[in-house]
């Protein structure tokens, strides 16, 4: 995304009139998910300063309160870049933040645009009651990922399938529900809080949990964009 991200972290790039990361934060608030954590790496201090300028600080709780869609949202931060000099990859960052999270929680990447996605409270509660350790949303494959990532069974199980075996695969949207137990043995040996700053990719962990039958999924066919290039960003902002 350079040169755009030389001075502005990707989640703060403007998409249709507001920072990219505010779209999912507002959607979460609409469903009553008002305790949110922002995980930062590149230019993390710029992200925190942005929210500091718009929030009231709650020093006793190390939180900041922000008004989104008439809902007061409490925002916490987990700073990979400040603490370890760079990003810890997706799973490593989640594990770093685990002590600040509830037993089940939403995750969405800061560089995807899904303006019509509903962070459903009913789906969340169903997931909490289930045996699944993860529930992920898949999307039809975009041009930049034509082979897809994971399969989907008729019963809603996410499948760890080989891309070259003729299976129908879909792209992982990055939106997911997780339980803390996914980031613990036997699937993960990195301790909660990731005190050593170990880089840990999410896909191998998810694939292992899929093989154990512990990951469910569903297909999202609404608007979705991985805002990974200046051209994709420009295309989004040119849409009417």
Stretch-by-stretch model annotation:
Residues 1-4:
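A phosphate-binding catalytic loop at a beta-strand-loop-alpha-helix junction
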Residues 11, 74-76, 133, 157, ...:
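Conserved beta-strand segments of alpha/beta enzyme cores
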Residues 14, 18-108, 119, 185, ...:
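Conserved N-terminal catalytic core of the sugar/cofactor nucleotidyltransferase
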Residues 134-149:
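Short beta-strand-to-loop element that shapes/binds the nucleotide-sugar donor at the catalytic cleft/hinge
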């Amino acid at each position: 995304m350079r040169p755009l991200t030389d001075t502005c972290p990707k989640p703060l790039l403007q998409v249709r009139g507001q920072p990219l990361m505010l779209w999912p934060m507002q959607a979460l608030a609409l469903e009553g998910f008002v305790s949110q954590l922002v995980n930062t790496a590149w230019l993390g201090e710029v992200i925190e300063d942005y929210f500091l300028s718009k929030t009231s600080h709650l020093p006793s709780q190390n939180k900041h309160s922000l008004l989104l869609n008439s809902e007061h949202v409490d925002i916490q931060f987990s700073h990979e870049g400040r603490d370890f000099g760079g990003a810890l990859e997706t799973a490593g960052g989640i594990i770093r933040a685990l002590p600040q999270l509830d037993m089940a929680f939403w995750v969405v990447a800061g560089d995807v645009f899904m303006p019509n996605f509903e962070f459903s409270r009913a789906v969340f509660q169903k997931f909490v009651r289930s045996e699944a350790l993860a529930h992920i949303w898949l999307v039809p494959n975009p041009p930049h990922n034509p082979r897809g990532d994971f399969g989907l069974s008729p019963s809603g199980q996410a499948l760890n399938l080989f891309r070259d075996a003729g299976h129908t695969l879909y792209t992982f949207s990055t939106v997911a529900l997780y339980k803390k137990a996914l980031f613990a043995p036997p699937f993960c040996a990195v301790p909660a809080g990731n005190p050593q700053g170990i880089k840990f990719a999410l896909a191998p962990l998810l694939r292992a949990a899929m093989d154990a039958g512990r990951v469910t999924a569903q297909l999202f066919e609404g608007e979705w964009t991985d805002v990974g290039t200046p051209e994709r960003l420009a295309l989004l902002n040119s849409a009417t």
